[in-house]
């Protein structure tokens, strides 16, 4: 309701301006497109007028613009919002852009030295960006004996050169540490400080620190509940008990919770995992989840996920692991070598029917878990949203177009509105909303990246506008344009 009031207020101001000036000249007019707004359920042919960074008019009547773009036969949708990415540079953002993404956020892990990172991206980003507080790193900082690792990461972070793989490998020695009460208190103070730098909630990837004491985990949720700070979590193990753990912690502390990639966290029990989330929602708890539309996951081979017993936990063996650097399937011998040297693997662990179940489930958000750039990186890095629209909407008819767009735009925007108020103006095609707009051909959109060929731009995304500026035109990236803006959490000072 508050969101609608904000947008209506801006709409009224724009309306009054257009009444006073009946011959309004818009900066850009999108003509004749199929306009879809998942909040109002608008799905019809309209013209869209844009002034500066806002949608100023949506009309069946002709509009006049400085630039007129004919989008007949194309869908005009809110820009896609990705809650779960790990790429930190424009190299990854360009693939996301060609997948229709206008806002890409690192919320599972978060980012260390948030203030420095936000500053390093200012005026340089293709699309909107933001991140949560990196709980593993703030925890790591609280342990005195790891000061050298803290300093190393600081130097790369302030240059904008740190990667999630470097960060995870640096903090790995602390993954098994049992924190004292004093260290837990320091961690919480670190979290509060990082939230004040703009962090969008708290990234708690407990699956990478699975030996963390449940008492320490519960304390993090208590802090989140007290502050009403959204927790994003990769659960302890890929099983139902781990999903129960975080839901229980969230319910007992009243902490808002988002469980990442439930498809790979619940594996063969995805319906039960979804039922648990739904039951919590029906009781009034702010708990949500997401998935990506692929049957394989991806992560660092040096992570705690591959500690003793990983085959039993994941239900695969060495040949279910694919080495990103070369595309080869692993053996025991190569596994042992690469586990020492470090790098990223793809885990072929899921079945197609599990993905369909998750995509069809009401309220489940689409998010990519896109990886840092490598030619053979997981294809979800480049094709998540186009794959949903091409395969699961057009080809397999698992969900309809309106529902798919809702899962990619309105649902992630609404999930973040409490923690990041600026998201109230995203995920919508409405007068007064931000002009983050993705325009695609519903008959041709499809992902092109594969496990074998590696990353490729998706097909069918024709235009992408970020904050009123075109970043993609006729399927081509616009050179030297960087309209992406930071998305900050509500605690920023």
Model-derived regions, located:
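Active-site microenvironment of metallo-dependent hydrolases
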Residues: 6, 17-46, 51, 60-61, ...
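Metal-associated gating/positioning segment near the N- to mid-region
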Residues: 61-124
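Conserved beta-strand scaffold positions in the cores of enzyme catalytic domains, especially
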Residues: 68-70, 80, 129-131, 288, ...
């Amino acid at each position: 309701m508050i969101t609608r009031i904000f947008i209506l207020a801006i709409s009224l101001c724009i309306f009054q301006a257009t009444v006073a000036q009946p011959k309004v000249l818009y900066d850009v007019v999108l003509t004749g497109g199929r306009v879809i707004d998942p909040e109002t359920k608008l799905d019809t042919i309209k013209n869209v007028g844009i002034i500066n960074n806002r949608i100023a008019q949506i009309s069946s009547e002709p509009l006049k613009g400085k630039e007129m773009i004919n989008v007949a036969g194309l869908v005009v949708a809110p820009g896609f919002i990705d809650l779960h990415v790990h790429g930190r540079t424009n190299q990854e953002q360009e693939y996301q852009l060609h997948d229709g993404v206008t806002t890409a956020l690192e919320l599972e892990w978060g980012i260390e030295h948030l203030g420095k990172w936000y500053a390093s991206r200012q005026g340089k980003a293709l699309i909107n960006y933001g991140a949560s507080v990196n709980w593993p790193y703030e925890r790591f900082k609280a342990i005195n004996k790891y000061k050298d690792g803290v300093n190393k990461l600081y130097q790369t972070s302030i240059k904008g050169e740190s990667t999630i793989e470097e960060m995870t490998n640096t903090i790995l020695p602390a993954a098994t540490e049992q924190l004292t009460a004093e260290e837990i208190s320091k961690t919480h103070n670190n979290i509060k400080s990082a939230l004040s730098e703009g962090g969008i909630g708290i990234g708690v990837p407990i699956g990478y620190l699975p030996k963390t004491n449940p008492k320490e985990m519960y304390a993090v949720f208590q802090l989140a509940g007290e502050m009403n700070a959204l927790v994003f979590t990769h659960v302890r193990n890929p099983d139902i008990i781990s999903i129960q753990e975080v839901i229980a912690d969230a319910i007992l502390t009243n902490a808002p919770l988002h469980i990442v990639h439930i498809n790979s966290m619940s594996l063969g029990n995805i319906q039960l995992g979804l039922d648990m989330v739904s039951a919590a929602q029906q009781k009034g708890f702010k708990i949500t989840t997401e998935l990506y539309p692929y049957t394989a996951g991806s992560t660092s081979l040096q992570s705690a996920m591959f500690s003793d017993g990983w085959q039993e936990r994941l239900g695969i063996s060495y040949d279910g692991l694919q080495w990103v650097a070369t595309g080869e399937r692993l053996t025991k011998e190569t596994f042992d070598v690469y586990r020492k040297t470090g790098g990223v693997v793809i885990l072929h662990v899921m079945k197609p029917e599990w993905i369909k179940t998750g995509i069809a489930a009401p309220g489940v958000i689409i998010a990519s878990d896109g990886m840092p750039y490598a030619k053979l990186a997981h294809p979800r890095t480049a094709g998540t949203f186009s794959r949903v629209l091409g395969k699961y909407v057009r080809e397999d008819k698992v969900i309809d177009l309106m529902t798919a767009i809702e899962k990619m735009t309105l649902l992630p925007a609404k999930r973040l509105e409490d923690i990041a108020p600026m998201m109230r103006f995203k995920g919508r095609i409405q007068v007064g909303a931000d002009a983050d707009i993705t325009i695609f051909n519903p008959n041709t959109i499809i992902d092109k990246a594969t496990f074998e060929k590696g990353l490729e731009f998706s097909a069918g995304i024709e235009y992408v506008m970020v904050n009123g500026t075109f970043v993609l035109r006729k399927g081509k990236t616009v050179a030297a344009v960087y309209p992406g803006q930071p998305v900050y959490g509500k605690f920023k000072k």
